[in-house]
Amino acid sequence: MASIQVYLDNWFVRHVGSLKTAIRVVFGVVWAIDGALKFQPGVADSLPQMVSDAGQGQPGWLQPWFGFWSQTVSANPGFFTTTIGLLELSVALALLFGFMRKIAYTGGVFLSLVIWSVPEGFGGPYGPSSTDIGTGIIYAFVFLLLMVINATFGPSRWSLDYAIERRWAAWTRIAEIRSAHSSGDSGGSHAEEALV
């Protein structure tokens, strides 16, 4: 049994480069599906009711938040549905192609939190029938995990950012979460890239 564990541990270590890329790409597919679903017929018509329903049963101190968003979304639901769909598709493309990852991950955290706090109603209201806290907060944590992976392992050679960085080094400021280890070492980061 111990040899199986050692084999699996070694497999993960040997394939860390492709695994971190696979996580990013699969997450991009999830965001692409989310974004595409926003363009289905009837979604814009149902958004105001979804936001209104999210406010039902929430604590009194949250009612102004949901009241504001319910009124705002009701004024032009098509605009909000299209905007959210386009933002989700933009995040999806950035994840799929590994483009502007630092900006995409940061924007993804904020977009996920907006989705979690408005149409998902912070995952609540919480009571005996509650089964989860909503997907938006989990998405935000995945984006934070991708930031940690990028800071820990550096550039991903299976990304559009990597190709751009090879021609234009300044792109690193847009694309990479720089760790203290890689920012102080001018040549070490490219040597580490070869391993990943």
Language model segments and positions:
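Extended, low-polarity transmembrane helix blocks
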Residues: 1-87, 97-196
